[in-house]
């Protein structure tokens, strides 16, 4: 395990998650926000589902990290290297999804991953 990620990896193995507040700088987050509002392909492929209470949520999903803003962020060494340290080997970006809703409006997404 790379020494620089050992504390984060220990937390991941203990808790099942790790929060890295400095992973993206504010300018990178803003680029993602802008891309989410301007990406016609992502917006065009969005669909609605009902949550467990019947309220509607809108989401978009894709299976490969492309050459767009989201794909480039997913391939950043500071992202990939951490995940490889957490999981103990090479990783493959299999699937992405984005919940496309305003805060406090519409349904809720119950995250579940096995």
Which functions belong to the PLM regions below?
Residues 1-15, 20-113:
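Non-heme Fe(II)-dependent double-stranded beta-helix
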